[in-house]
Amino acid sequence: MNFCKLEIFIPETHLKILQETLAEHDAGHIGKYDSCISYYHVKGTWRPLEGANPYKGEKDTLSVEDELKVEVTCRVENLDTIIEAVKKIHPYEEPVINAIPLIRTGL
């Protein structure tokens, strides 16, 4: 089986719905455990450009906000479905979701 790690940046207000969505799509399933995620408080910056519809912030103004970086392991074959599900519940117009291949895991 091939696995990857997802990094998802999201406002803390949306953590619960993200956890539920990930669990519904079997992300974070490790052995005899499910809902295994890690999250960290981080600062995010962005500047909305012409035509953007930001969750927070104003056009041409650099924003700095607290957010969470969520990490979760998933099977590669479920990756596209998981990313689409996360995008549906994510408040950002352009969510940052990184998929990182894992060479070796404790699975």
Regions found by a protein language model. Name each.
Residues M1-L107:
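Hydrophobic structural segments
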